[in-house]
A protein has these predicted regions:
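C-terminal low-complexity/intrinsically disordered tail segments in eukaryotic proteins
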Residues: 205, 212, 216, 220-221, ...
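Secreted/processed peptides and extracellular or luminal domains of membrane proteins
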Residues: 149, 190, 226-227, 239, ...
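Structured recognition/catalytic domains enriched at protein termini
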Residues: 29-218
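C-terminal GPI-anchoring signal of eukaryotic secretory precursors
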Residues: 232-236, 240-284
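Residue-level signal for mature regions of secreted extracellular proteins and peptides
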Residues: 136, 177, 213, 226-227, ...
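Fungal secretory targeting signals
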Residues: 1-36, 273-295
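Cys/His-clustered metal-coordination modules, chiefly Zn-binding fingers
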Residues: 220, 224, 229, 237, ...
Length: 295
């Protein structure tokens, strides 16, 4: 299985980036315009973890080269729903974040694309023992010949929830063992069956709005009403991908990088030293330090 690990992107190259992403995506669009795009929350799962100041929240796009047709967006909320003693927590607004840069991600030439908030942009602090819920909403664009005849395209959305427990004597975060050889009971992703693609007229806008298409290219997806069954267990994070993710978490949100909310970045060459890039073991150590500081 191929994973997406592009090179870091600087702010100075953002315009070039948009052109290259558009060009590469357009070539891919010509060759393949139908299939099932699946989006899964692969970490955390419905399991128990030690308290940590930062718990990675990682999504996987399967058949990801088709994702640009959907102009994808993900919104994430995290709630403490039960205290460790079984009582109900005092109400507080959810910790939230949007992966708004997904619509410009380079999904091309990859079977699987990982998307996640990087450390400095992650608002989630799973430091309190108890039962938590991570609720995520996948939002995607669709169009039909009839809708485009009326100069509109439509957004659909689907919401999923994962329940996890935070407890002091539980396992530390390990992305490799935490996603390999595991059952996915209670996990459910979103699968969208693209049957065709259509050209978007320049006059088209979102239904009920005046805003125009902001995604890559000028092609949108036509989908079926039947919903394919998702299979989150198909995706795991191997050591190489975990190392890349650890570096992205550590360095991917700095001012030198264009994408601050979605990232599958490989560490820059000058960050790959022992001092600059965490190994897989170092990733566990990073979260372990956060956990230790919370005890």
């Amino acid at each position: 299985m191929a994973y997406h690990v592009p090179v870091p992107i600087t702010l100075g190259t953002s315009l070039t980036l948009h052109f290259l992403v558009f060009s590469a995506t357009w070539v891919k669009m010509v060759g393949a315009s139908s299939g099932v795009v699946e989006v899964d929350l692969i970490f955390p799962r419905n399991e128990t973890y030690a308290p940590t100041a930062y718990l990675p929240i990682i999504f996987a796009f399967q058949n990801s080269h088709l994702a640009p047709f959907l102009d994808p967006l993900i919104h994430i909320d995290a709630y403490l729903v039960q205290n460790a003693n079984g009582s109900t927590p005092q109400w507080a607004p959810p910790e939230s974040i949007d992966l708004e840069q997904l619509r410009w991600a380079n999904f091309t030439n990859n079977d699987t694309y990982f998307a996640y908030p990087t450390y400095q942009r992650n608002e989630f602090t799973f430091a309190t023992e108890g039962i938590w819920q991570v609720t995520w909403t996948f939002n995607w664009a669709v169009c039909t010949e009839d809708s485009l005849a009326n100069n509109i395209f439509i957004r659909n959305e689907s919401q999923r929830t994962t329940t996890l427990t935070i407890r002091k004597d539980a396992q530390e975060v390990d992305l490799v063992s935490g996603t390999m050889g595991k059952s996915c009971s209670g996990q459910d992703g979103v699968a969208v069956n693209i049957t065709n693609t259509l050209h978007i007229p320049s006059s088209a806008h979102w239904e009920g709005q005046t805003d125009k298409w902001e995604g890559q290219g000028d092609i949108c997806a036509s989908t079926t009403s039947s919903v394919p069954k998702s299979d989150p267990c198909r995706v795991s994070i191997d050591p190489a991908a975990a190392a890349s993710i650890s570096c992205s978490i550590t360095f991917g949100s700095s001012a030198a990088n264009f994408s601050t909310t979605t990232s599958s970045l490989t560490c820059p060459e000058d960050k790959k030293s022992a001092a600059g890039c965490l190994t897989v073991g170092g990733l566990a150590a990073l979260f372990g330090v956060f956990s230790y500081l919370l005890h």
